[in-house]
Structures are given as C-alpha cells and as structure tokens.
Amino acid sequence: MGVADTARLIDSGRDVRAVPARWIDLGHVAPSSFHATYAGLAAAQTDGAPPIVVWARVAPHISLGRHQDADAELKCPLAVPVVRRPLGGGAAWIDESQHCYVLIMPLARLKGRPSEWFGWGLAPAVRTYAAFGLNVVRDGQDLSLSGRKLAGSGAATIGTCAVLGSSFLLRFPVERFAACIAAPSQAFTAWLVRALRDCLTDWESHLPAPSEEALRQAFRQALAETLGWTLVEDAVSPAEAHAIAQGCGEWEAGEQGPRARRVPYGIKVKRDVFLTERHVGDRFARVLTRSGRFEAVALSAGLPEAADVLLRACPPAFDALRRSLAGFVPREEAASWARLILETACFHSD
C-alpha cells in the first residue's frame, strides 16, 4: 500500500504526503507500563492531534487480547507476568527479541472501517521487511513470509483514536510459549509445539537480525513512504502522563474476564489453523484444522495413520465424517465419534 492508496483511507484535511507525527521511544519497559502508555496516550488525544508512533522493547510476558481470560487460556500461575492488553487478538508472547510498535491515529483523520485499519497500519512493516530483503505479505491481521506467520496485530478504538499494535519478531521461543498455554493433555502441548513450528516463523530463521538502530531507521523511512508521516522525536506530556497513570492498573490480567477460551477447547495457531481438544467422560478428541479442513485427528479410541490421510480429504460434515470413520472405529460408534470431532473442531473465528 503506497501513499496514494493510503490517502483513500486517511483524511487529514491536508496533503497526506506531509503529515507531522510524533515518535515516542520508550526504550526498555515493563509489560504493564508499555500497555498503559499507549492506551493512556490514545485516551489523551483530541480530534486534531497528530498521529503517534510508540516504539519499545518490552520485558518478557504473555499478552492476552482484551476479551481473553488468563484462567481459561493459560497454565496459571506462570513464571512471567500476564497482561490483558487493550487491543484485540489472541494470546501472544512478548519479550526483548521483539521490537514492538503501536500506531495511534485520531479517528477524525480516518475514512475506512475498522476492518480496513490493518491495510494502512501494517503497510509500513511490510515496506520495512522489504528493505531488508524479506518478501513479507499481509494476510488479514497477520504478516506472512513464505506462507508462515511472521507477525500478528491487534487493534481497538481508545478514546477518539484508532490504535494498532504489532512487532518485529526477531526470535520466537516456541516451547516457552507453548508451555504457557492451558492444555488438557501433554499430547495437546506436543501438537501445539509442532503446529507452531510448522505455521510460524521469525526473522532469524531467514536472515541475521538487524541492529535496533538500523531497524528503527528503516521503519521510520517506511512510515514516511507508506503513510506520509513526517516523524518528530517527542516525549509523553504531563497531561498524557496523568492519563497513563490513571489507567496503569487497568490492564492487569487479574481483572474479571469472560471465563471462557477465545477458541473453545483450544487455540488459534494462525489465521486459518486451529488446535482443539475436548474430553467427554473417558473419551477425547484432539483436532488440528487448516483452511477449513481436517489436518490431523486423534481419538481416545485410537486411529491409525491412514485415517489422517482419509480425513484430510473429508469435508467437515457429519455424514461424510461418519462414513470416513466407519473403517477405523466400530461401525455402531462412528456417528458418536463424528459428532464429538465436529463439536471439538474449530474451522474459523471472529
């Protein structure tokens, strides 16, 4: 997305190619401070305020989406802090191997629907990756490289601003993140590790990571090229600091949540991949789906490897699934197993 495309979504009342914007570098910060800062900054802005870019490296923590509950999603207590961020999306691991950024844009400057924010909001990151030779593309709210998720993002309206956050992921600790996710069995965690390795990637898996200064400068240049923002180094004002302090405890994960998983019985691995497991009495079904189809299924009744091959070709419909299972479980039980699989599986999420 170039400046001309962005102009259709951003209406500043003046030339979109010359929009002054504030760059606020927080340095290395604690998790709660990071999330409180961008939320407080957004809450303190007025309609005529310039856009803001918040840049930071954040201490290790699990960041939950605004509608997630720690007790439902995680193996609590954990050795790292848990913070429920004011943005959407699912559970994410954040640490110093990521460079986090948040774009804050007064709604008065925007034309598009919230679903369109990811187009302009992630365009600078795509341009930044390209500057280092990485062919990254946007896939909805995610950024992908060679078909694997490289970054996720979350957005929300805070005060009178659109807020969108993401990060440059240099290195991702797969096992450490998987060990934090609530699991009904050890096998679920093992499947999650394999799915994460298969579906996710990081910068260092493709190229040596750049220095923070090189990445910082490339991102600033990309913001100018894609959004037309002329960045000025700035700091939090006293009024903004007051707004930040007022909301500083608001995003702690101990706050009451929905007490249910965002994905029933499991987790969204990336945009079109879900891992779920459900136990009913002494029976269980574990299901990995990809692009609306079965990728792998395990049952307490036991399934041979040949079943996975057949199920991958099976549409997620009761009759088709029952017929496919009939060759691997007692025929009189095929219907109940088909029902359990379909009740367990997730093929899409909001």
Question: For each predicted feature, which ranges?
Answer:
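Glycine-rich, small/acidic residue-mixed loop/short-helix segments
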Residues: 298-333
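Active-site glycine-rich loop that binds ribose-phosphate moieties when present
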Residues: 120-128, 148-152, 186-188
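Active-site loop/lid in soluble adenylation, ligation, and acyl-transfer enzymes
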Residues: 2-75, 85, 155, 184-185, ...
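A contiguous pocket-lining binding segment that forms or flanks enzyme active sites
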Residues: 138-183
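Contiguous, small/hydrophobic- and glycine-enriched helical/loop subdomains that border
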Residues: 96-144
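A glycine-rich, hydrophobic loop/mini-helix early in the fold
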Residues: 76-107
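Short histidine-centered catalytic/ligand-binding loop motif
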Residues: 102-118, 201-210, 324-328
